[in-house]
Amino acid sequence: MPVHFNQSVGMPPARDGARPPPIKGGLMGKLIPATYSPNGRHPRIAPPPPPTPPAGAGAGAGAAPPQRQLLQHSPTTAPGPRRPSNPSSPQHPQQPGIDRFPQIIPYQHEQPQRRPSRQQYSASPPVDYSFGKGPKQSGLDQSSSTSSSVSPKQEMKQMSIHNLLSSGDQDDQDDKSINNSNTARASSASLASLASPRSVLPPAAMPSPSPSFSTSEYHLHVRQQPVAARSCGFGERDRRVIDPPPIVQMTIDDPSATPDQMQQRLRHPFSVVHCSIYNETGEEDNSAMPEDYRQQRRLMGTLVASPFVGKDENGEDGCFFCFPDLSCRTPGSFRLKFSLVVINPADMRQGLRTPIAATAMSDVLVVYNAKDFPGMQASTPLTRKLKEQGCLISIKKGNEKGGGGGGGGPSGSRDQYSDDEYDDDGGGGSGRAGKRKRIRRS
């Protein structure tokens, strides 16, 4: 059976003749049965039944209609008592089928919790130890100890904004006074350290001692001067070395050192000598090529040498640095500069540099073209002596010619690289010697 919603709204009785306010709960109605018309188009709504008067009420004009129950705003859920009717105010009859309004419970707002006091957040109070006196607590500890005995009213008074601001200012003043005292102590300590003749650093700040040697004790001497060389151009296959190979000797001047200490310094494996090429006067570094050439080095080969401790041709011990693999790309007159660096393994850290201990400059070296090259010289006694002791250096018999063109013909090319039995680059030395003998016989 279809039902319809009747929008008859009940209104609470007004006070003092004023119009009652609308109910916020929404529209209220009653379910009324309906019947259909014979044609089936529109439903016919049955009229509402007449209101039934309450029992015991008379038919006279003095009979008052029933009163509705007012909303009781009480925090409890039980319905409140009925409000007595006021004869002077207009009354509204209660419609049948409509129950009394449910009681509305107001929303209970939660009271915000009070922020804890400043003393609850404070950590353990600092203790000031002074010489000749016992430990003394700070003002914060005293305030926290006294705050436990105050009443709640006094505590609320202490938590007022004025008191908090004044206490914060007092704390700032205390911090400033502490900082000023610390800075005064630091400044007095720094002045005392400057005034003292010997200022000793604490053990944690002192650097660790490193076995570094004095740079003024080392000296370099060129024992074997370079004389001539053939320019090798910009290729890598037809390369000619400087003749004779430069040999540099390192000496140490230290009267207080014992012979064992001197041998230890001479055999130091981290002593390195670097070679660079300069102009004829020795004032300008010519390692870089001019702009019209390709970006290559002028001096090529092994530019760094390690120490070799042995005896020279006179039988004396020494520390030697040999450069048997040096070549020059362009012809001209140059000088070779040798720089000694003594590396200390204890100071090998990133960002540090090792100073140059000693330097030495060679005599003038002349680099010839292929046609003007006079030829190779025979190896010196010093070179042969070092070779016998195990030094990696080549031995040359040499074929120096005075007319030039030593490297032009095929025989000159063979003679300038004719090696004897001590040559490390050999392997074909005996064959070349046999060829040379056959050529001479013919």
Swiss-Prot record:
What broad class describes the main subcellular location of this protein? nucleus
Null mutant phenotype reads: Leads to reduced formation of conidia. Exhibits significantly reduced pathogenicity, developing only a few small necrotic lesions.
- One GO-annotated biological process of the protein: sporulation resulting in formation of a cellular spore
Tell me any Pfam family this protein matches: Velvet
Q: Name one GO cellular component term.
A: nucleus
Ranges where the Velvet domain occurs: 213-396
Q: Where is the composition biased (Pro residues)?
A: 45-54
| Domain of life where this protein originates | Eukaryota
Instruction: Establish whether keyword Iron-sulfur is in the entry.
Output: no
Q: Residues annotated as region Disordered?
A: 1-192, 396-442
Compositional bias (Gly residues): 401-411
InterPro entries recorded: Velvet (IPR021740), Velvet_dom (IPR037525), Velvet_dom_sf (IPR038491)
The UniProt regions of compositional bias labelled Basic residues, in chain numbering, are 433-442
Q: Where is the composition biased (Low complexity)?
A: 79-97
Identify the keywords attached in UniProt to this record, alphabetized.
Nucleus, Sporulation, Transcription, Transcription regulation, Virulence
* Location within or outside the cell: Nucleus
**Role according to the record:** Velvet-domain-containing protein that acts as a positive regulator of sexual development. Plays an important role in pathogenicity through regulating positively appressorium-mediated penetration and invasive growth.
Q: Which family does it belong to?
A: Belongs to the velvet family. VelC subfamily.
Q: Which PANTHER family match?
A: SEXUAL DEVELOPMENT REGULATOR VELC, SPORE DEVELOPMENT REGULATOR VOSA
Q: Tell me what this protein is called.
A: Sexual development regulator VELC
Lineage runs: Eukaryota, Fungi, Dikarya, Ascomycota, Pezizomycotina
